[in-house]
């Protein structure tokens, strides 16, 4: 297992971040993942990192803070936190987040407090988030197990067995087998995603129509100059990186006011430390006018109330139902993995790279091209075995994009 973990750490730094010699790496990790964070730091130095800067998190202390701290703690942006994120982002440092959290860390926390905390955090990270969404620096999110998360995924196993099983599952999603060829497999995978992306870009769809047996009946208009993206992103300096390990998606941005109908989530969503189930949105002219859920509805409504843009959509992503992650049969209770098992949408901020020349546009120019703006970006999964997506071109042709949950192009 140690060799597999070293290979995974190297994959993250070399393919995920494409770390350059002399570049600073900001590594954000839960304290429970310290052993793996150390492997990532060593891999970074092996590739010539100038410095590795650690930013530790802890679910227990996070929950204690949300339950017991005074209101001012969630309402006052801190200059030192703003400086930490802004200074390194402006320097072009690479950013790695090891994604591992208890899906129910913040269960029972007041939704109003969650919204206040997100607004304050967004104020502290404004420059960082803007540059990240525009691929201003290499960034990558990759997972590692912690006990509470593993127990949720494998509730019938002992804690140790659950953690081991989650490690095995994670390594399979990122194509790490221990043979030393994970990087080569990823180059092939990125080439496949790129080919599909180029086919979609050549078709220049005007809109997409989603239907399935859950009740989804949604039409999504796309900006005239939209671009599909997949797998490999690129900084303004031309440095390629893979923002999510794993990734199976091809994505673009919708026209902000061009979505109408009903969409139903196919999988639970973990958001702000709570689980939300059976999401159902009613959408008119791009805006979510009604949000329902069988569990966590208060958390869901808080999430779409962060700002006005949170009630509009920022991402349309295509993932085949027979993707390796969905085929594993596991529900990860973690968006990094579950979004790569299913077609998904996101409410909130759109990625500038999804419009021609978007990374160089001002906020006003992005608005004029129909891209949504928000402090938040939350993916939720809509793909099912019977999902049908029909694309309409600008000359009126209707083409099957998805049939029975998989690509039909």
What does each model-identified segment do?
Residues 1-260, 391, 397-400, 407-409:
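Active-site bordering "gate/hinge" segments
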Residues 10, 201-203, 272-274, 309, ...:
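Short solvent-exposed loop/turn micro-motifs enriched in small/polar/acidic residues
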Residues 107-110, 150-155, 231-233, 274-277, ...:
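A short secondary-structure junction signal
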Residues 250-308:
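Long, well-ordered mid-to-C-terminal structural blocks that present hydrophobic/aromatic surfaces
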Residues 258-260, 276-278, 285-288, 311-315, ...:
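Active-site lining segments that contact anionic ligands and/or coordinate catalytic metals
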Residues 290-359:
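Dual-mode signal for accessory low-complexity, basic/Gly-rich regions
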Residues 364-409:
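Extended hydrophobic packing segments that form well-structured cores
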């Amino acid at each position: 297992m140690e060799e597999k973990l070293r290979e995974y750490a190297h994959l993250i730094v070399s393919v995920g971040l494409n770390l350059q010699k002399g570049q600073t790496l900001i590594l954000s990790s839960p304290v429970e993942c310290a052993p793996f964070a150390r492997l990532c730091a060593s891999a970074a130095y092996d590739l010539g990192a100038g410095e590795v800067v650690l930013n530790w998190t802890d679910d227990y202390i996070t929950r204690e803070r949300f339950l017991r701290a005074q209101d001012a703690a969630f309402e006052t942006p801190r200059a030192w936190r703003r400086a930490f994120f802004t200074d390194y982002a402006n320097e072009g440092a690479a950013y790695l987040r090891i994604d591992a959290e208890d899906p129910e860390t913040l269960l029972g926390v007041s939704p109003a407090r969650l919204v206040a905390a997100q607004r304050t955090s967004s104020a502290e990270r404004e420059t960082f988030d803007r540059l990240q969404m525009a691929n201003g620096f290499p960034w990558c999110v990759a997972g590692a197990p912690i006990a509470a998360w593993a127990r949720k995924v494998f509730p019938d196993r002992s804690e140790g067995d659950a953690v081991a099983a989650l490690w095995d599952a994670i390594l399979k999603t990122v194509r790490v087998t221990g043979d030393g060829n994970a990087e080569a497999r990823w180059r092939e995978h990125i080439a496949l995603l790129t080919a599909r992306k180029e086919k979609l870009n050549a078709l220049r769809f005007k809109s997409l129509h989603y239907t399935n047996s859950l009740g989804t009946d949604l039409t999504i208009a796309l900006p005239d100059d939209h671009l599909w993206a997949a797998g490999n992103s690129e900084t303004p300096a031309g440095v390629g990186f893979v923002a999510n390990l794993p990734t199976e998606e091809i994505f673009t941005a919708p026209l902000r006011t061009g979505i109408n109908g009903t969409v139903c989530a196919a999988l639970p969503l973990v958001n702000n430390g709570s689980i939300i189930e059976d999401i159902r949105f009613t959408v008119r002219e791009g805006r979510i006018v009604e949000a329902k859920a069988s569990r966590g509805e208060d958390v869901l409504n808080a999430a779409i109330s962060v700002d006005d843009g949170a009630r509009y959509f920022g991402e349309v992503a295509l993932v085949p139902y027979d993707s390796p992650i969905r085929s594993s049969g596991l529900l990860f209770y973690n968006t990094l993995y579950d979004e790569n098992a299913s077609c998904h949408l996101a409410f909130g901020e759109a990625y500038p790279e999804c419009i021609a020349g978007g990374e160089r546009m001002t906020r006003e120019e992005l608005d004029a091209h129909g891209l949504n703006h928000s402090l938040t970006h939350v993916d939720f999964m809509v793909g099912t075995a019977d999902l049908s997506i029909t694309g309409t071109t600008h000359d009126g042709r209707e083409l099957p994009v998805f049939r029975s949950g998989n690509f039909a192009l």
